[in-house]
């Protein structure tokens, strides 16, 4: 499949004669309904297509890093991290690898149905037209799950569609990055087919001072393909059909550390833009994940397999229906309903003796949410107000943990958990006041929630000598928050936004240390000496105070951008987790900074971005700290003929040691070292 996708990507370098009607009148957009006016009251940042296409890495997670306070659980990206660590969050609501920010693509939730992480290699940058990041919870308009905020990805629409686009670049460590797309436009619609492929021999994740004979480079190979067709089916109505497939294979730098992901998505959205606006969406997602795990001895001379997660099938399906009744000038109302149903299980071989497994585990279940929502905006003179409410019904069903002995088939763990259900009421209110020309005051209050993932509920796991037990009794997480800030636009093309906020997330899910090996512990079995026993638990709360600044300026051919976030997250815990009270959640830096400059001229275009991440704790007990890091990425584009440009890119220009993990033995894993790319782009 990989070779086929690569051939498709490179085929984008040939002309597409079928696009001769590209100048015809386009009456469809490929978009959803218009943005809500009440969004003016929120902390909102928009990333345009120009920036999406011109990052140093050409990867979505690098583009999202422009938004200070956006974070994944680990600092490493989707070329070397284990996929399960790539949940996404905002505003210091961290300490957990599941996503606490809601990520949607054209209205479809994108978190993995089983584990809540994000399959970043499935999002080729060339397919995206715009990214909207709304910080703060309570965004019930897009569904449940927006604790920390909402990240909306929009596919390329009619305006940005081009007959031919393609790029190919060769990089450090035998890396290859290729994308391509073909587009066809007609008066009644458009179609786009695209593919992307990336591979590399990888770097050695363990830093040189800690390496042993067992350590080796961590290669990766990733591919995706996408088909999107948009057709007018009535004078004011269009149908949008999308299908995507991806594969992802990575190794973590030792034997028995490979993990793979694959998935297929299909979605149908119908949008009506008549007097009564409306849209209907239906989608289905299938996923599978595999991962091997190894124990490394203290001298790092041997790797011994400890677990083979050989099959993790998961399915998500859902839909939404929304109407926008005509209520007159200054009033916008959206009413709707949605549902998302998830199922999945992990199948694992564990307890290896003489290199062979002797036990089998199956763990999984089903979860679902169904909700009603209303979102209203009022524009009256200098005041814009927003009021949103959402009522959800949730269910957790068919939960199980089954463990058997391979030799006899005899079960030794048979746990079937009681079904649970409940309701959640959430909402948001906000106000924006135009106090003067170019000066807007903003405030908002909100409440959001998230259902635990199947992974958190039912799957125990091990990382090296440490073992973490699942918890089928986890409660949903709930956040309450308040924002206040302003947006200043002193001149055309200049914008500065400042926001202060407070969030309290009740029933915070965290991996809580309960004991140390050697010993036998509930839910995981034996933990060897030097290993820790943890369990997923609901802490009392996580409180975060913070503030953020976003600024941009367009000065002729030069554009400046900057984003800063400072947070003070504090755990509130009692009972078995009382030792965590007053500590900071793991993997949560207090300060984030991103700043960049872009130049677009006749002879060349260039971009440079600097990012700083403050130190953060590796563990829940705040005993080990990852050092602060500053990285610089850059890009240069030089046109050679019309539609063809040469490109040079560099990631981590000064080869900063970006620490991604720190073991109890002091072994440091790093994120991406300096990586240089040289290639070409075409666009017709």
What are the roles of these predicted feature ranges?
Residues 61, 65-108:
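Extracytoplasmic beta-strand/coil segments of soluble accessory domains associated
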Residues 108-135, 217:
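Short acidic/polar hinge/loop motifs at secondary-structure boundaries
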Residues 139-140, 152, 159-161, 165-169, ...:
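Periplasmic-side early beta-strands and strand-to-turn transitions of outer-membrane beta-barrels
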Residues 200-206, 216-222, 232, 236-278, ...:
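Flexible loop and strand-edge segments within Gram-negative outer membrane beta-barrel domains
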Residues 218, 310-323, 365-373, 469-475, ...:
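Outer membrane beta-barrel strand-and-loop segments of large Gram-negative receptors
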Residues 286-290, 343-352, 393-411, 419, ...:
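Surface-exposed extracellular loop regions of Gram-negative outer-membrane beta-barrel proteins
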Residues 329, 379-385, 495-497, 501-505, ...:
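Gram-negative outer-membrane beta-barrel transporters
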């Amino acid at each position: 499949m990989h070779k086929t996708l690569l051939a498709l990507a490179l085929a984008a370098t040939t002309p597409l004669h079928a696009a001769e009607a590209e100048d015809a009148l386009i009456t469809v957009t490929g978009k959803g309904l218009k943005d809500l006016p009440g969004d003016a009251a929120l902390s909102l940042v928009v990333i345009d297509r120009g920036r999406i296409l011109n990052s140093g890495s050409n990867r979505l997670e690098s583009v999202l890093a422009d938004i200070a306070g956006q974070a994944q659980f680990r600092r490493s990206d989707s070329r070397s991290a284990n996929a399960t660590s790539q949940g996404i969050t905002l505003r210091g609501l961290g300490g957990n690898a599941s996503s606490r920010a809601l990520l949607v693509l054209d209205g479809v939730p994108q978190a993995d149905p089983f584990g809540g992480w994000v399959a970043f290699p499935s999002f080729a940058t060339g397919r995206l037209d715009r990214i909207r990041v709304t910080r703060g919870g309570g965004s019930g308009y897009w569904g449940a799950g927006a604790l920390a905020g909402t990240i909306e990805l929009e596919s390329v629409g009619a305006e940005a569609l081009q007959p031919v686009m393609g790029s190919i670049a060769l990089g450090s460590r035998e890396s290859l990055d290729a994308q391509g797309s073909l587009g066809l436009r007609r008066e009644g619609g458009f179609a786009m087919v695209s593919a992307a492929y990336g591979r590399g021999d990888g770097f050695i994740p363990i830093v040189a001072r800690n390496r042993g004979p067992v350590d080796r480079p961590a290669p990766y190979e990733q591919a995706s393909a996408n088909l999107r067709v948009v057709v007018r089916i009535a004078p004011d109505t269009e149908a949008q059909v999308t299908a995507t497939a991806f594969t992802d294979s990575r190794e973590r730098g030792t034997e028995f550390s490979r993990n793979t992901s694959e998935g297929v998505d299909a979605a149908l959205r119908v949008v009506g833009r008549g007097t009564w606006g409306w849209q209907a969406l239906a989608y289905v997602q299938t996923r599978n994940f595999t991962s091997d795990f190894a124990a490394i001895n203290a001298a790092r001379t041997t790797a011994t397999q400890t677990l083979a997660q050989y099959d993790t099938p998961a399915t998500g399906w859902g839909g939404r229906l929304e109407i926008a009744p005509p209520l007159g000038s200054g009033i916008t109302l959206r009413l709707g309903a949605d549902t998302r149903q998830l199922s999945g299980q992990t199948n694992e071989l564990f307890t290896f003796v003489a290199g062979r497994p002797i036990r089998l585990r199956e763990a999984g279940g089903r979860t679902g949410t169904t909700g009603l929502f209303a979102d209203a905006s009022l524009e009256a003179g200098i005041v814009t107000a927003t009021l949103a409410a959402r009522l959800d019904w949730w269910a957790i069903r068919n939960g199980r943990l089954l463990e058997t002995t391979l030799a006899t088939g005899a079960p030794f763990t048979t746990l079937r958990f009681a079904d649970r259900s409940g309701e959640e009421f959430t909402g948001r209110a906000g106000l924006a006041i135009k106090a003067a020309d170019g000066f807007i005051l903003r405030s908002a209050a909100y409440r959001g929630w998230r259902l635990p993932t199947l992974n958190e509920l039912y799957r125990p796991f091990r990382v090296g000598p440490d073992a973490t037990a699942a918890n089928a009794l986890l409660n949903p997480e709930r956040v309450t928050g308040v924002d206040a800030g302003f947006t200043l636009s002193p001149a055309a093309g200049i914008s500065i936004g400042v926001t202060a906020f407070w969030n309290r997330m009740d029933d915070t899910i965290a991996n809580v240390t309960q004991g140390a090996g050697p010993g036998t512990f509930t839910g995981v079995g034996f933990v060897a000496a030097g290993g820790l026993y943890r369990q997923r638990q609901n802490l009392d709360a996580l409180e975060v105070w913070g503030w953020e600044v976003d600024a941009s300026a367009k000065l002729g051919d030069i554009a400046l951008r900057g984003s800063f976030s400072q947070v003070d997250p504090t755990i509130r815990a009692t009972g078995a987790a009382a030792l965590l009270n007053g500590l900071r959640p793991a993997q949560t830096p207090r300060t984030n900074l991103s700043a960049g400059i872009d130049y677009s001229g006749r002879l060349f275009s260039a971009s440079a971005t600097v990012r700083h991440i403050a130190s953060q704790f590796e563990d829940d007990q705040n005993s080990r700290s990852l050092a602060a890091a500053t990285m610089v990425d850059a890009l240069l584009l030089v046109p050679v003929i019309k539609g063809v440009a040469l490109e040079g890119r560099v990631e981590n220009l000064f080869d900063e040691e970006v620490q991604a993990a720190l073991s109890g033995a002091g072994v440091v894993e790093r994120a991406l070292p300096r990586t240089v790319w040289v290639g070409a782009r075409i666009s017709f």
